[in-house]
Every structure is written in C-alpha cells, then in structure tokens.
C-alpha cells in the first residue's frame, strides 16, 4: 500500500493518491477482469451507463476545436483533499451502524451463493464512504440510509458468486441489504 513497483523498483506514492479507472463490459474483445486482490483496492464501483442525448451532444461539440481536457482547471488542491478526508473521519458512526455494516459483510461471507465474501478492506470502504456521504449531506453523523445507499457501490465488486448461482454481484448484495 501507498507504493508502486515497476520492474522490481519500489516508488512511494504521493499523499493523497487516487486512481479513477474505467472498465469496458466483459463482452468486449480483449477485456479481462482484474484479480480479486486488485478489485478490492477500489473504494467504489459505479456504473454510469450512457449519457442522455443533450449531454452527449455537448460532449461531441466540445471536441470541435481541440481536446477539452487541455482546458480543465483544478477545483481542489492536494491540501483541500487531505482536509476533506480529515473532516470525513470526524463524522460519527454509531455502534449500531458499525454492527449493521459488519452484519452485511458477514452475510456475504456466510452466503451459500457466494464463493468470495467482502474483505475487511471492503468493510472499511463502506464505513469511510458512509462517513463521506454524511459529510456531503452536511450531517455530523451517519444514518442507515447512507450505508444502504453505498453498500452496492462499495461491496458488489468485492464478492464472487459461485459458478452455478444466478444473479449479478449487484443483485447478491442488494438481496443481503
């Protein structure tokens, strides 16, 4: 953690360090799934679907005269991100909600339909993401709906269904919640 190795040489990563990744559907030729250990390192997995027509029109026309990415402006500094992370950690999580998160995680581990349940890293991700959502909602505490709202995004990519079971990872986690 907090480092990367290239050709046997290890390099420390800056703080904060974030990765945003995209993934093509598995049906695409040349697309391979990541190993469980790598998937587990992503805080959330969000499916965005296709944009609506008006947004896609704006997207297309923004490419008329060059690359729009060249004109992006920073909205936060590294220090801003670190401060927001610190603030999010101060958001209160009642013991009953900690128990609720643990119950969800343990249900994935003891589910006959799942080959792999959620790791401790996944539990921490749901906990931290719930704190962040509460902060964005301008609350000083997490509520059950925060956990419910984020459970699929924080956990579904961390579970693996047994080969003979029907349903997606998303459906499996939704069934547990």
Language-model features and meaning:
Residues 1-76, 81-91, 131-133:
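Canonical AAA+ ATPase core
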Residues 50-54, 61, 68, 89-93, ...:
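Non-catalytic accessory segments flanking P-loop/AAA+ NTPase cores
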Residues 52-53, 78-81, 98, 144, ...:
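Alpha-helix initiation and N-capping motif
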Residues 62, 104, 149-153:
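Short acidic/histidine-centered micro-motifs embedded in hydrophobic/aromatic stretches
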Residues 71-123:
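Conserved AAA+ ATPase small/helical "lid" subdomain
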Residues 110-177:
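C-terminal engagement/docking regions of AAA+ P-loop ATPases
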């Amino acid at each position: 953690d907090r480092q990367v190795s290239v050709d046997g040489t290890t390099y420390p990563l800056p703080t904060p360090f974030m990765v945003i990744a995209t993934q093509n559907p598995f049906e695409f030729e040349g697309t391979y799934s990541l190993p469980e250990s790598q998937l587990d390192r992503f805080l959330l997995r969000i499916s965005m679907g296709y944009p609506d027509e008006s947004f896609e029109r704006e997207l297309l026309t923004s490419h008329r005269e060059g690359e729009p990415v060249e004109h992006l402006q920073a909205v936060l500094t590294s220090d801003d991100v670190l401060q927001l992370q610190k603030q999010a950690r101060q958001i209160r999580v009642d013991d009953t909600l900690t128990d609720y998160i643990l119950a969800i995680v343990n249900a994935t581990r003891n589910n006959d339909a799942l080959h792999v349940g959620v790791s401790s890293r996944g539990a921490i991700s749901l906990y931290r993401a719930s704190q962040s959502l509460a902060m964005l909602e301008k609350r000083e505490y997490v509520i059950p709906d925060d956990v419910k709202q984020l459970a699929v995004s924080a956990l579904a990519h961390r579970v693996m269904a047994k080969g003979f079971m029907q349903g997606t990872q998303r459906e499996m986690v939704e069934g547990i919640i």
